[in-house]
Amino acid sequence: MSSKKGSKTSKTSRSVKQTEEYYDDDAEFQNSEDEYPPSDEDLDNSGGSDDENTQSGGLSDAPDDELGEDSATLDIDPDDEAEYDTDGDEKFNPIDEMGEPEDPDDPSEQEEDEVEDLGSEDVDNVEIEDDAADIEDLDPELVDEARNSKSKQCYMKNLNKDFIALDEDDSGIYSKIEYKKIPDNERETDPILTYYEIVRILGTRAQQFNYGAKPLIKGVEGMHPAKMAFVELTAKMTSFIVRRHLPGKKYEDWRIDELGMIHTITEELFVPDNFNWDSITALHKTMISNQQKNSTTDTETLSTQENASTRVSGSNLRSRSGSKSSKSNNSRSASKSNSRTESKSNSRTGSKSNSRTGSKSNSRTGSKSKKSSNTKSKSKRNSDNSDDSDYSDYSE
């Protein structure tokens, strides 16, 4: 409501200023006419027609202070007539008033009017209602619900994750995939060297020649390393394998002699002067034939070695099985002979030992019994002799 009251005061001050400015403008206009009266030349040029004077609002018989009824509001701008109020009664203007009109029956507006009517000294004595008591009377659960309703809700909590494909961190999946080589009979790319592959092969091979590598073709000694690499490549004698990577971490391996060349290189850095290409091609053909022969001989030797190894392994297996069977038979016969000899020896040794031990024990026990009987008889005799001697002593 303070804004509404402020708008009222601003309206009144604005109207007063406008009236003051109006009167000041009129006075300045009159003073300007008095200070700068029109000259005779201006009047002659104007023609002195009554129509122009009446249209311009000038030249009347009445003095400046006593204007007629028709020209009483002649100097007022029509746009300012709505703001200029001669009666002093202010009316509501929807353009100037941005807010809603005041409601005299609203109790809150009446209270604000009363507070504004009070003096500056009575402002401190005005009792302001504390809303803390009203807040304490509220149910805390309702307050929490109101706060939660205003906050942003997470809609992912209520979704069923079993039927939703959530975006996971799959940045390391491609790195975990292992490279897979495509077999030679399933290669898909064209057997032609690309321009990039040619340049890469020439640069790498020239660098190897700079480091002291020996060329694989004759007749190029003393040339520039780039020319040596070019001649070796045209002869398809470069011992490189071109690896072509494909999507899905797959790759193909191509030998240089398997790839053709459709791109021509005419730079002087690579192409030697007055070089016999026919000899190189012939040498290349002979080298290829030799390689094929060597490969066939190698395969034959490998096959023969494999067959020999299989034969040797078969004989070894047979000999091992024979030795195992002989060993088992020997062990069986040995066990049988051992069992027989043990039984015989046990029976013989048992009878002998029993007879010997029996005779020895009997003889020993017999001799011992004889000795004991002799000792007993001797002791009896001694006792008899002692008795006789005693009696003899007494008899004496």
From Swiss-Prot:
Report which superkingdom the organism of origin falls in: Viruses
Ranges for the region named Disordered are 1-137, 290-396
Regions of compositional bias (Basic residues) in chain numbering: 367-380
GO MF annotations in UniProt: DNA binding; DNA-directed RNA polymerase activity
Question: Which keywords label this protein?
Answer: DNA-directed RNA polymerase, Nucleotidyltransferase, Transcription, Transferase
Q: Which Gene3D superfamilies match?
A: 3.90.940.10
Q: Which InterPro entries does the annotation name?
A: Pol_omega/Rpo6/RPB6, RPB6/omega-like_sf
Enzyme Commission identifier(s): 2.7.7.6
Query: By its UniProt entry, which SUPFAM superfamilies does this protein fall under?
Result: RPB6/omega subunit-like
Compositional bias of kind Polar residues: 290-312
GO cellular component terms, semicolon-separated: DNA-directed RNA polymerase complex
Can you tell me where the transmembrane regions are?
Answer: none
Task of the protein: DNA-dependent RNA polymerase catalyzes the transcription of DNA into RNA using the four ribonucleoside triphosphates as substrates.
Protein family membership: Belongs to the archaeal Rpo6/eukaryotic RPB6 RNA polymerase subunit family.
Q: What is this protein called?
A: DNA-directed RNA polymerase subunit 6
Species whose genome carries this gene: Acanthamoeba polyphaga mimivirus (APMV)
